[in-house]
Amino acid sequence: MHLVDRVGANAPHKKYERVTTQPENPFFNIVHNQSVAIIPSFTLESGVILYDCPVAYKTFGVLNESADNVMVICHALTGSADVEDWWGPLIGPGRAFDTSRYFIVCCNSMGSPYGSASPCTLDSTTGRRYGPEFPLTTVRDDVRYGSTITMKLGCLLTYYRIHKLIMDDLGVRQIAVVIGGSMGGMLALEWAYFGKDYVKAVVALATSARHSAWCISWGEAQRQSIYSDPKYDDGYYSFSDPPYTGLGAARMSALLTYRSRNSFESRFGRNIPDPSRHPYINTSQPPSHPAEEHYDIHNEGFRNRKGFRRSSTTTSDAPPSPTRTSSTSSTDAITPASTTPLHPSRAQPSGIATPPNSVSDPFRPVKRPCPTYFSAQSYLRYQADKFVKRFDANCYIAITRKLDTHDVSRGRTSTLHEALAMIEQPTLIIGIESDGLFTFAEQMELAEYIPDARLKRIDSPEGHDAFLIMFAEVNRYICEFLREVQPEIMGKEGVHVESKVGEIRASTTGEVEDITHW
């Protein structure tokens, strides 16, 4: 699917250089047909200055003559600027993201590997990738400007946030609505603080007014998974040998928070994968010794294992030689082990049967009394394997730390509720009853303290990811809200947009399949 990407004839000449490649970043080409603006210098909230700072974005639809039919969509943690990739069923004429009525803009957040400044992009001052030296960026760095500050020389300076610079460069005069879920909902709330004269309405799904201790803790556990991978190397790893194991473990942990216990139970229960496809655990051949069978069960699922090693004949701490290399081992082939008996110091008395690993009586694996490999495990491993091919470990660390900075009251008011009361726009809050990450109680809090808010509930057992799964409900709630608060846009006949809207296509990042095809 490719939607028209253009602005009205009144759009000004673009101020910032545009590029179409990012050769230093192996993840850039995962997102198709995106634009990248290069900001010559940009000052972060921390005071750090980024030079030649890239911002990736995509647009859909047409900017009208008054430049005020703009819909900004903000992506979630591992999303990109390609809305079609993760919210495709909602985009197109007559749908919530109506390309015949709105000019839709989605910018990639800093820290993400999909084109904006991140650990994967070049530091122009050194000519090298930032890697672990990429500075902390906040939700506010992405979105809004800070207060006007009186400088030492008496002049006034306003710090503009980076997505606002893109809006200005596209000729946007007013934003009709900002929409985002999860991390994107955090950005949507921050957009509201531009005021109702610039941002007319807000839709926030499955998000919070500030990142909770629960969410901070999950992010920490996921980062520690990455740190524990020896290949992480303080973040100075090469793209040819990244910390896949740690990043995969972090993704597994995250997936458990995106669903609910009941959704996992109903989908998997205690089912096991097809035994005909997995005759031997982690190997392509049966075990040759009882200890090897025990080893296989014990290490099943460990991707970096080196292979079964027969016990040593000495008391030395030196590792004994492996007998074979597992099919999942990342090491080179290893020479066969000695034929020395397992415990020669414990000689068998006369009359005792020969051990089952002898040549005369080859070992036969015993029938296991219970399953040791379940479909739920298979699902997590499969999704982790997909994810590590499309995401970067340093970026995962950077963007989860960005989440930790989120608190709409920080630097604004003494209490959270006072900060929410500052939001003047009509606001739609959508929550999921079974969401254990951004709880429904947090959505109720947003709706209670934002003065012109209304709350909609999604009754789904699918947990947090329901905001990306329950397309019909989300589409209906957003359309109803926009017809209520923006009749001047929704009441007009839409312009013709050449597109293949509604066409089902494969997700380029795998985000759609990860969420819906489980």
UniProtKB/Swiss-Prot annotation:
InterPro entries xref list: AB_hydrolase_1, AB_hydrolase_fold, HAT_MetX-like
Keyword check for Iron: no
One function term, GO molecular function aspect: homoserine O-acetyltransferase activity
UniProt keyword terms in alphabetical order: Acyltransferase, Amino-acid biosynthesis, Methionine biosynthesis, Transferase
The protein's Enzyme Commission number: 2.3.1.31
Pathway: Amino-acid biosynthesis; L-methionine biosynthesis via de novo pathway; O-acetyl-L-homoserine from L-homoserine: step 1/1
Reactions mediated catalytically: L-homoserine + acetyl-CoA = O-acetyl-L-homoserine + CoA
A single BP term in Gene Ontology: methionine biosynthetic process
UniProt biased composition (Basic and acidic residues): 290-303
Keyword rRNA-binding: no
Composition skew (Low complexity), residue ranges: 310-341
Active site: S182, S182 (nucleophile), D435, H464
Region of interest: Disordered: 267-365
AB hydrolase-1 domain residues: 69-468
PANTHER family per UniProt: HOMOSERINE O-ACETYLTRANSFERASE
Family, per entry: Belongs to the AB hydrolase superfamily. MetX family.
Role noted for this protein: Commits homoserine to the methionine biosynthesis pathway by catalyzing its O-acetylation.
Protein name: Homoserine O-acetyltransferase
Gene: MET2
